[in-house]
A protein has these predicted regions:
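N-terminal nicking endonuclease/strand-transfer module with a His-rich metal-binding environment
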Residues: 1-167
Length: 167
């Protein structure tokens, strides 16, 4: 499932009605970074190289995060949710739910290594809802681009670098 992404839901800063607060302690936070800091880490050097080449001031980029946020080409980040089974066959309250937790934890432990062009800045396993599920928020990016910033946000190119074809 691909969604808009709600970091507040994932970190439980906001708690939905279907959450069992007594089981929230069983949730797993794999990572949680501030997205603006992630953008600085990933793109500041590329932005500086890009700006150094510009002859026109109006083409310079002051803040790449804001450029992407205001633009229509790319999204700031993407979220995917992984779940095994449903509330009937993998309920978080029983042994099958614990099996799902182990599988999803192992999956997450290897996700970044398998997907080097998807920078994971937030990942949370929820055990306090009916079915265990994993939220992964990531910034898709590429390096070595010939146009614009040499390191930039691009879901299509990041997935192509991972071997996925399509448009």
């Amino acid at each position: 499932m691909i969604g808009k992404g709600s970091v507040n839901h994932n970190t439980r800063a906001f708690t939905a009605k279907n959450v069992d607060k007594n089981r929230s302690a069983d949730n797993v936070e794999f990572c949680q970074e501030d997205i603006k800091q992630v953008y600085h880490k990933l793109f500041d050097e590329a932005r500086e190289r890009y700006n150094a080449k510009q002859k026109r001031k109006d083409r310079m980029i002051d803040n790449y995060y804001e450029k992407i946020r205001r633009g229509k080409q790319e999204k700031l980040f993407h979220e995917v949710i992984f779940q095994i089974g449903n509330k009937d066959d993998m309920n978080a309250k029983n042994e099958d739910g614990l099996l799902a937790k182990r599988i999803l934890t192992e999956f997450m432990d290897e996700f970044q290594a398998r997907n080097p062009n998807l920078y994971v800045f937030s990942a949370h396993l929820h055990m306090d809802e009916e079915t265990p599920h994993l939220h992964i928020d990531f910034v898709p990016y590429i390096t070595g681009s010939k146009r614009g910033l040499d390191t930039r946000v691009s879901l299509k190119s990041a997935l192509a670098a991972e071997g996925f074809a399509g448009g």
